[in-house]
C-alpha cells in the first residue's frame, strides 16, 4: 500500500500525462486545479456534539470547509497493549467438550419421552433451547440440531399456534409467540394471524391486572415476535404497541432482576439494532442470573459456560485482527488525511458484532476497510474538495490506472491509491472464495457511488435543493451501503453465483431497501449538523420543499413512517419462505443494514463516536467476559 506523499504537487506534470485516448476532459479540468500541499486547519479537532464547520486554508490559499470531528479514539499503542490468554489451546479444547455436551442435550430431546421431556413440554423446551443458543451467540455449532428441533415444532404448528407440548389441549401465548418468532426467523411459513387468537372479544390483546412473572415473560416474547413483521401485518403492529406499553408498565412494578434487565434491553434495542454479539454479551449477564432457567430441564450452566468461552476465544481473534487493521490504516497513509474522520476500529466492531464466526476474518476486515474509505470519500466530497477537484478525481477513478493519480491534487493521490489498492486486494480475496474475477463488477459499483457523490457535491456548490424523489434515488446510492457490503460478502465461504448475487446486490429489492434505511435513518440523525456545514439537501429539507407549509416535525414523522415500512420490507426480503435465495445468502447484507442502523440509533455515531459507539467497542471488542 503506497503512503501519501507530502511533496509539493507539480501542477504542470499532470498536463503531460496521457490519461487515456478519451481523457481530453481530464486534461482540461487538470489545468484548472492549483497546486495543493498540506493544508492548515483553522481549528483543532476535539470531541464535538455540534459537528460545527471549521475553515481550513491550504498552502495555495484555497478556503476549504471541514467538519469539526473528533480524532481517532483508538491509537496504535492502545491496540497493541491489549492482552488475552483465551487463544490458548486449552480454552478451545474445553469449548469443544462443551459443544459435544450441548449436542447431547439437543439429542436428548429427540429421544423417547422421559421425566424431563414429555408430551406436555416437548415443544416449548425445543423452542426455548434454540432461542437460548441463538441469543447467547453459540448457534453456529448446532445448525443440524436446530433444524431438527424446529422441524419437530413446525410439524405440530397449526393456525391456532402451539401449546407447551404436543399433547397440550390449548395453545398458550408464550409458546406460540416464541415459536412464531423462532420459526419465522428460520424461514418457516407461519402466519401472523395466529396472534389474533390471543385477543379478547373486543379485539384487544388481553392481560391480567396482576402481571405475574409468567405473563410478563409471555408478553415479552410477544413483543419480540412483533418486531419480525412483514408488510401489511396489522396484527403485528397492534401486538407491538400493546406489548411495549405492557412491558413499560411492568418495569414500574417488578423488582430489579434479570427479567427487568432483559425487558430493558429488548425495549431499548428491539431487533434491528440489537446486533448479535451485543445481544450475546448482554444475554450472558441475564442468563446467568435468571432463576427461571433453574426450572428448565436443560443444563443451563453448560450453555452459559460455553457462551462465555466462545465470547472470549473470539476476543483473542479480534485482537489479532485489530492489530492487522491498525497496521493497514497506518501503512495506507490514512493518518495524514487530516480532513476526514477515522473510524476504522468502530467499523470493525460493527462487522464483528454481526459476523463472529472465526472463518469470516475477510468479511470483518473488508467491511472495516471499505467503510473507512467511504468515510474518507464522504468527507472529501461533502466538505473538503472543490467541485473541479472532485470532477477530476471522479474521472480519474473511472480509468482505474495508478497513473491517473498523477493528475490529482496531492491530498487526493493518497485517497486514490487507498481506494485502488484496497478494491483490488478485496477482489483477489473474492476470487479465491467465488472462483471468478469480480473486479469489474465491483468497480461499476464504486463508479455509481462516486457519481452519486459528485451529484451531491454539485448540489452543495450551487445551493440547489432537489425534489424529494431526486434526492432519495441519488441518496440511496450515496448512502454507501452497497459498496460497504458487496466485496466483503464475496470473500465469505458462501457461494454467490451471478443469479444469486443479483438477488442480494443491485438491482435487488433487498439492496434497495437496505440502502434506503441507511439514507433515511442517517438523515434523521445528521440533517442539522449537515446543514450547519453547508449541506442543505436531506430527506427532511427536500420533503419540506415538496410540501410547502410542512414543519420539520412533519417531515420527521413522514420519514420515520417510511423507515418503519422499509424495515418490514427488509424483513420480508430476508425471510420470505417462498424465496429461491437461501437466508444464509441474504443474511449478511441484511445484518449490515442492522449494523448501520445501530450506528444511527441515538445520534450520528460515526461522527460522534465517543459515546454509545465507544461503549459498544469496549463491551464487544476490548473487554472479555468474566468466566
Curated annotation (Swiss-Prot):
Query: What reaction(s) does this enzyme catalyze?
Result: (2E)-geranyl diphosphate = (1S,5S)-beta-pinene + diphosphate; (2E)-geranyl diphosphate = (1S,5S)-alpha-pinene + diphosphate
Quick one: which residues bind Mg(2+) 2?
A: 378, 382
Location of the protein in the cell:
Plastid, Chloroplast
Q: What GO molecular function annotations does the UniProt record carry, in alphabetical order?
A: lyase activity; magnesium ion binding; pinene synthase activity
Q: Can you tell me where the transmembrane regions are?
A: none
Q: What does this protein do?
A: Terpene synthase (TPS) involved in the biosynthesis of monoterpene natural products included in conifer oleoresin secretions and volatile emissions; these compounds contribute to biotic and abiotic stress defense against herbivores and pathogens. Catalyzes the conversion of (2E)-geranyl diphosphate (GPP) to (1S,5S)-beta-pinene.
Query: What protein name applies here?
Result: (-)-alpha-pinene synthase 1, chloroplastic
Cofactor, how bound (note) = Binds 3 Mg(2+) or Mn(2+) ions per subunit.
The species this protein was found in: Picea sitchensis
Name the UniProt key words of this record, in alphabetical order.
Chloroplast, Lyase, Magnesium, Metal-binding, Plastid, Transit peptide
Q: Where is the transit peptide?
A: 1-36
Amino acid at each position: 500500500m503506497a503512503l501519501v506523499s507530502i511533496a509539493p504537487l507539480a501542477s504542470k506534470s499532470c498536463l503531460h500525462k496521457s490519461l487515456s485516448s478519451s481523457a481530453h476532459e481530464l486534461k482540461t479540468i487538470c489545468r484548472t486545479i492549483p497546486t495543493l500541499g498540506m493544508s492548515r486547519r483553522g481549528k483543532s479537532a476535539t470531541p464535538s456534539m455540534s459537528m460545527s464547520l471549521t475553515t481550513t486554508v491550504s498552502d495555495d490559499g484555497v478556503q476549504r470547509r471541514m467538519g469539526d470531528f473528533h480524532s481517532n479514539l483508538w491509537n496504535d499503542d492502545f491496540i497493541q497493549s491489549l492482552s488475552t490468554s483465551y487463544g490458548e489451546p486449552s480454552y478451545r479444547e474445553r469449548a469443544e467438550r462443551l459443544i459435544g455436551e450441548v449436542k447431547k442435550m439437543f439429542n436428548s430431546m429427540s429421544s423417547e419421552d422421559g421425566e424431563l421431556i414429555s408430551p406436555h413440554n416437548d415443544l416449548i423446551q425445543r423452542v426455548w433451547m434454540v432461542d437460548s443458543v441463538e441469543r447467547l451467540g453459540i448457534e453456529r455449532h448446532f445448525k443440524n440440531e436446530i433444524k431438527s428441533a424446529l422441524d419437530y415444532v413446525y410439524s405440530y404448528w397449526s393456525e391456532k399456534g402451539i401449546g407447551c407440548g404436543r399433547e397440550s389441549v390449548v395453545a398458550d401465548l408464550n409458546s406460540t409467540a416464541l415459536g412464531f418468532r423462532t420459526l419465522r426467523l428460520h424461514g418457516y411459513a407461519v402466519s401472523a394471524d395466529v396472534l389474533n387468537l390471543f385477543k379478547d372479544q373486543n379485539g384487544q390483546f388481553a392481560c391480567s391486572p396482576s402481571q405475574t412473572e409468567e405473563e410478563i415473560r409471555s408478553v415479552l416474547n410477544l413483543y419480540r415476535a412483533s418486531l419480525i413483521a412483514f408488510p401489511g401485518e396489522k396484527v403485528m403492529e397492534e401486538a407491538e404497541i400493546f406489548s411495549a406499553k405492557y412491558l413499560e408498565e411492568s418495569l414500574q412494578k417488578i423488582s430489579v432482576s434479570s427479567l427487568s434487565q432483559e425487558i430493558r434491553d429488548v425495549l431499548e434495542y428491539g431487533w434491528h439494532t440489537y446486533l448479535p454479539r451485543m445481544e450475546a454479551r448482554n444475554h450472558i449477564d441475564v442468563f446467568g442470573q435468571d432463576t427461571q432457567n433453574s426450572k428448565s430441564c436443560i443444563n443451563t450452566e453448560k450453555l452459559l459456560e460455553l457462551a462465555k468461552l466462545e465470547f472470549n476465544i473470539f476476543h483473542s481473534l479480534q485482537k489479532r485482527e485489530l492489530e492487522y487493521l491498525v497496521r493497514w490504516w497506518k501503512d495506507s497513509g490514512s493518518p495524514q488525511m487530516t480532513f476526514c474522520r477515522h473510524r476504522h476500529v468502530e467499523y470493525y466492531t460493527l462487522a464483528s458484532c454481526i459476523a463472529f464466526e472465526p472463518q469470516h476474518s475477510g468479511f470483518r476486515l473488508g467491511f472495516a476497510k471499505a467503510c473507512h474509505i467511504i468515510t474518507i470519500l464522504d468527507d472529501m466530497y461533502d466538505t473538503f474538495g472543490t467541485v473541479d477537484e472532485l470532477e477530476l478525481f471522479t474521472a480519474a477513478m473511472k480509468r482505474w490506472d495508478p497513473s491517473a493519480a498523477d493528475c490529482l491534487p496531492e491530498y487526493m493521490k493518497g485517497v486514490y491509491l487507498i481506494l485502488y489498492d484496497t478494491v483490488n486486494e478485496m477482489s483477489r480475496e473474492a476470487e479465491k472464495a467465488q472462483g471468478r474475477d469480480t473486479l469489474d463488477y465491483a468497480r461499476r459499483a464504486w463508479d455509481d457511488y462516486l457519481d452519486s457523490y459528485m451529484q451531491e457535491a454539485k448540489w452543495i456548490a450551487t445551493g440547489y435543493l432537489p425534489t424529494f424523489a431526486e434526492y432519495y434515488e441519488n441518496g440511496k446510492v450515496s448512502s454507501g451501503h452497497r459498496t460497504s457490503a458487496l466485496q466483503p460478502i464475496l470473500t465469505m465461504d458462501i457461494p454467490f453465483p451471478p443469479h444469486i448475487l443479483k438477488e442480494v446486490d443491485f438491482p435487488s429489492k433487498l439492496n434497495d431497501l437496505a440502502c434506503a434505511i441507511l439514507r433515511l435513518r442517517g438523515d434523521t440523525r445528521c440533517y442539522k449538523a449537515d446543514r450547519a456545514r453547508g449541506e442543505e439537501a436531506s430527506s427532511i429539507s427536500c420533503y419540506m420543499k415538496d410540501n410547502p407549509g410542512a414543519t420539520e416535525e412533519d417531515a420527521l414523522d413522514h420519514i420515520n413512517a417510511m423507515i418503519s415500512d422499509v424495515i418490514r420490507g427488509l424483513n420480508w426480503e430476508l425471510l420470505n419462505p417462498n424465496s429461491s435465495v437461501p437466508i444464509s445468502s441474504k443474511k449478511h447484507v441484511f445484518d449490515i443494514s442492522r449494523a448501520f442502523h445501530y450506528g444511527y440509533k441515538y445520534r450520528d455515531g460515526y461522527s460522534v463516536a465517543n459515546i454509545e459507539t465507544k461503549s459498544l467497542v469496549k463491551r464487544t471488542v476490548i473487554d472479555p467476559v468474566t468466566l
